[in-house]
Structure formats: structure tokens, C-alpha cells
């Protein structure tokens, strides 16, 4: 394999690995946000159950529900942003992987071409050797 092909493949591998790490981080952030929404919903449900038994809790529950709705909406926006970022990262990773495969294919073709040239050169040398032997007298 030629130096330039090895360098391209190494750089492409690095790019693919970097994009895989980025995608993993984005997915982790999205999952954490989804977990926070789940916890927020569970917390709101627990507060509602606690407020059922206390008549004075009705006043603070109004504010609590509004705050909970806002936090939930913020988390849902964050999840949506993560999903969009994740889709972009997946596309970039797919493109980088395609480029890597192209470079590997070009390197393989260059290797095959070099082997064909070497075989043709060896065949020409053997032909020349047999012609010389025939000219000398068949030794």
C-alpha cells in the first residue's frame, strides 16, 4: 500500500472514530434528558398525591404545576435538539464511513495494479531469459 493511501485511511479512521464518539455523547445527552423528563413526571405525580390529603397544598400546587410544565417543555425542547443533532451526526458518520471505504477500495486497487505490473515485469524477464538461452544454444 502506498504512503498516501495509508495516510488517507488513517485520517479517515480517525474521523470515523471522532464522529462515533460525538454521536455517543449526543445520544447520552438525549437519554439523560429523557430520564429527567421521566423523573420530573414521577415527581409531579408524587406531589399531586401528597397534595390530595392537604387542603392548603392547593395554593402551592398551582405554581408547582406551572413550573413543572415549563421544566418539562424545556426538557422536551432539549430532547428535540438532541434528536436533530443526532440525525446530523449520523449523516456525518455515514459520509465519513463511505469515504473511508472509498479510500480502502482505491488502496486495494492500487495494490492489485502494482501486483499486476510486477507479474508482467517478471514475465517479461522470464521471456527475455528464455530468448537468451535459446539464442545461446538451449542451455
Swiss-Prot record:
Signal peptide segment: none
Entry similarity comment: Belongs to the FliJ family.
GO cellular component, one term: plasma membrane
Main localization of the protein described in the UniProt heading: membrane
Source species, domain of life: Bacteria
Localization in the cell: Cell membrane
Keyword Membrane: yes
Gene3D superfamilies named among the record's database cross-references: 1.10.287.1700
InterPro entries tied to this protein: Flag_assembly_chemotaxis_eff
The entry's keywords: Bacterial flagellum biogenesis, Bacterial flagellum protein export, Cell membrane, Chemotaxis, Membrane, Protein transport, Transport
Name used for this protein in its record: Flagellar FliJ protein
A GO BP annotation: chemotaxis
Upper lineage: Bacteria, Pseudomonadati, Pseudomonadota, Alphaproteobacteria, Caulobacterales
Bilayer disposition of the protein: Peripheral membrane protein
Keyword hit for Ubl conjugation: no
Function recorded in the entry: Flagellar protein that affects chemotactic events.
Gene name for this UniProt entry: fliJ
Amino acid at each position: 500500500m502506498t504512503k498516501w493511501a495509508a495516510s488517507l485511511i488513517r485520517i479517515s479512521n480517525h474521523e470515523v472514530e471522532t464522529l462515533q464518539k460525538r454521536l455517543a455523547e449526543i445520544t447520552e445527552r438525549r437519554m439523560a434528558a429523557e430520564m429527567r423528563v421521566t423523573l420530573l413526571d414521577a415527581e409531579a405525580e408524587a406531589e399531586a398525591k401528597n397534595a390530595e390529603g392537604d387542603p392548603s397544598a392547593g395554593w402551592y400546587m398551582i405554581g408547582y404545576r406551572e413550573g413543572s410544565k415549563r421544566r418539562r417543555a424545556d426538557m422536551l425542547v432539549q430532547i428535540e435538539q438532541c434528536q436533530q443533532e443526532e440525525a446530523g451526526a449520523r449523516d456525518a458518520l455515514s459520509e465519513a464511513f463511505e469515504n473511508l471505504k472509498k479510500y480502502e477500495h482505491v488502496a486495494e486497487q492500487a495494490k492489485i495494479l502494482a501486483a499486476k505490473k510486477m507479474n508482467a515485469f517478471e514475465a517479461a524477464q522470464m521471456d527475455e531469459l528464455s530468448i537468451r538461452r535459446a539464442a545461446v544454444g538451449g542451455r
